[in-house]
Amino acid sequence: MEGINFSALAPRYGSRPMLSSWSDIGTSSMNGGAFNWGSLWSG
């Protein structure tokens, strides 16, 4: 999923696609994805 998100976000950020979109991906993954995975693992 990160690859898909990165591809979608990259053109939006122009000169710094990697840094900007990886920051967004990291934030959303930690807030959403990692939290959901934590719930699945603990459940």
Curated annotation (Swiss-Prot):
It comes from the Viruses. The record marks 33-34 as: Cleavage. The keyword Ubl conjugation applies. Ubiquitinated by Nedd4 following partial capsid disassembly; which might play a role in intracellular virus movement during entry. Pfam families: MCPVI (PF02993). GO terms for cellular component: host cell; host cell cytoplasm; host cell nucleus; viral capsid. Induction: Expressed in the late phase of the viral replicative cycle. The keyword Protein transport does not apply. Keywords: Capsid protein, Cytoplasmic inwards viral transport, Disulfide bond, Host cytoplasm, Host nucleus, Host-virus interaction, Late protein, Microtubular inwards viral transport, Ubl conjugation, Viral capsid assembly, Viral penetration into host cytoplasm, Viral penetration via lysis of host organellar membrane, Viral release from host cell, Virion, Virus entry into host cell. Residues 1-33 form a propeptide. GO terms for biological process: lysis of host organelle involved in viral entry into host cell; microtubule-dependent intracellular transport of viral material towards nucleus. Belongs to the adenoviridae protein VI family. All late proteins expressed from the major late promoter are produced by alternative splicing and alternative polyadenylation of the same gene giving rise to non-overlapping ORFs. A leader sequence is present in the N-terminus of all these mRNAs and is recognized by the viral shutoff protein to provide expression although conventional translation via ribosome scanning from the cap has been shut off in the host cell. N-terminal amphipathic alpha-helix domain is essential for the membrane lytic activity. This is Pre-protein VI. It comes from Bovine adenovirus 2 (BAdV-2).
